[in-house]
């Protein structure tokens, strides 16, 4: 796989790139590095996963690796990624590990580490773990007898997480009378998602909540909202929510069946927080992929947008750097820093419902303030991404595209950190212009690859 850690942990095709052998080595190296940094002879590492069929295989190997160094494991089973982050802090674990590839296809899986405070592991520690794995972990300690690590099932973990989410919701905004359609993506929120809404009094219609190990993200969830949009209209629901495979993001659907992405969610929540004096400073963090319309809508209310690279770790960095309490991505990764250390789809959807209930408006009315500029996003699969993008033909095409889009447009070219894909996004006043510049860029890439 080359470099192991990408922007979101270690990912690859399960049993081919992300093998049980690699999971075992990550368990050994991770527990050793963390034990050394916290000077603990017996670290406790919390482990969760999503619903992929390969999760059991990788979990068994990972846990074996951890226990082989003398560290103990707290297993929480199938839970959302943000639940693992929260529970790591809640149980004072040395670190948390989640086995998931989020919104990626079934064949993929991933292993991601969280530090004891619930934040993603710092780059330096990931590098230490990676170096140790690549060098080989055969020489690391192998305790015997009672010093071998134990595995503990944390049966109450799920309820601890749900209780915390409910504590983040304004108790005077009961959801009785609200109808919500919840698309669980046959993923990690298949159980916690519907129960959360039921406990708050909403009428819940759950879809894609019967995972079988192979149907995660299959024509459902936050990247495929067609079924959810139909269900919202059919049931005359007040809102629809689509989580992804590990429920660290969500997309919302209004009562008319229109999809509201992360830009809409940021605007709705930022305006509400600002009106109540809770957005201090009056600032949000958003990635370069956000629509220019978000900037315009927020600046009307004197709220600034701090821009950053794509990836929730970069959103978090920008939030810490700027003091922003709210930040996120168009894809639906939203961070409420007063409540969570990472993007949490369940928490985000609750916060939108809170605004819906408090305002007395419909979701379509709340979203009306965001007038999006036309946008075109294409994903191009290619190997040697950096080499191709640096080619003079491609560089010249990108330069000409930026000139054509002008000051009211935006061009973003971003190699994916987890897939052999380059994402090209163009925004501007006219759709035909976007189609032309994207076509010219694609043509230059094809010529560079020839």
UniProtKB/Swiss-Prot annotation:
Binding of Mg(2+), residues: 102, 244, 246, 248
Protein's GO biological process: carbohydrate metabolic process; peptidoglycan biosynthetic process; UDP-N-acetylglucosamine biosynthetic process
A single cellular component GO annotation: cytosol
Alphabetical list of Gene3D superfamilies matching this protein: Alpha-D-Glucose-1,6-Bisphosphate, subunit A, domain 3, Alpha-D-phosphohexomutase, C-terminal domain
Signal peptide extent: none
Domain of life: Bacteria
PROSITE patterns: PGM_PMM
Pfam families, sorted: PGM_PMM_I, PGM_PMM_II, PGM_PMM_III, PGM_PMM_IV
Record-annotated active site: 102
Cofactor(s) listed: Mg(2+)
Record's cofactor remark: Binds 1 Mg(2+) ion per subunit.
A GO term, aspect molecular function: phosphomannomutase activity
EC code(s) of this entry: 5.4.2.10
Keyword Magnesium: yes
Family of the protein in this entry: Belongs to the phosphohexose mutase family.
Function statement: Catalyzes the conversion of glucosamine-6-phosphate to glucosamine-1-phosphate.
Protein name: Phosphoglucosamine mutase
